[in-house]
């Protein structure tokens, strides 16, 4: 296992460093994958879909902090394509183990919310309608929402709202309260922002296949890579999630896990 910081050199409007989109684009363009399950959105409500080209990936570049039933598409995908990838949270990756997948990309996750809940939080705490949101993030212990307000005749101004995540964590999905996996340990590669500087992704490389792909991407100038990850920051969040083992009841977990909806 190897920890890296990575950033795309492509012009991608991504959540952080654009690594995941660049990785998937490379895999689709070079025959490593035929299709990949990713998540777009309709007014920030997650919509899982199957992407077969780099262009189709562009609708999936931002984080959505609401439940998405990604794995519903896996049966169709694996029946119709030979080399299938999955991008998802730790619970999606766990559920995806029952399928023959070529590449599993796991995303760091502390907690997730139902769509109506996140919509209400944004409206009640910030006075913002969901359709005004330009970006959401959970970072450094805070839930952060960005909007773009009109300024002048043709300009816009970014407005940032934030609250401590502790103030809303009790509103999260029930399955998140017993989940013990922060970094998607069953994935081939795990991606997030914790442990890297702003504008970069933290990448946990979990097998040689992914290591070889990343080396190829770096050699071709598609990504910039460095080994300056704050591993302790990742381990801190992993340990917090592991505390859920004390209350974890397997039957309850699989009953409410969003990957199995």
Curated annotation (Swiss-Prot):
It comes from the Archaea. The keyword Transcription regulation does not apply. Keywords: Iron, Iron-sulfur, Metal-binding. GO terms for molecular function: iron-sulfur cluster binding; metal ion binding; oxidoreductase activity, acting on CH or CH2 groups, with an iron-sulfur protein as acceptor. The keyword Amino-acid biosynthesis does not apply. Pfam families: FrhB_FdhB_C, FrhB_FdhB_N. InterPro entries: Co_F420_Hydgase/DH_bsu_N, FRHB/FDHB/HCAR-like, FrhB_FdhB_C. Belongs to the FrhB family. NCBIfam families: PRK09325.1 (NF006807). This is Uncharacterized protein MJ0725. It comes from Methanocaldococcus jannaschii (strain ATCC 43067 / DSM 2661 / JAL-1 / JCM 10045 / NBRC 100440) (Methanococcus jannaschii).
